[in-house]
Amino acid sequence: MIILSHRGYWKSEEERNQEVAFHRSFDLGYGTETDIRDIQGKLVISHDMPQGNEITFEELLQIMDGRNLPLALNIKADGMANEILRLLKQYNHTNYFTFDMSIPDMVVQLKTELTVFTAL
């Protein structure tokens, strides 16, 4: 069985998508599902529109500290696939998949060699 936390393993709403929640999840051996958006040219972890205090996708990979735990990445904006793939390769993270409900967006992600899942 594979267990994924949702926005990290948070104990209060304020911890969602925050470092403490990701540390807790990864330290227990759980992967996570989270959302990636962009703000001012940076990839950030945020379910809603970024406010400026989000951790970056690169910081999330640093928190993983080389643990190749499963990541389910919901890409929330266009044009991020190449940078996401670059960072995954930089951190040698292979245990991931991206997903999106938009078929055209998934086609773009597939062209970049990202692993993509969908629901029909």
State what each model feature region is:
Residues M1-L120:
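Phosphate-group recognition and catalysis centered on beta-loop-alpha active-site segments
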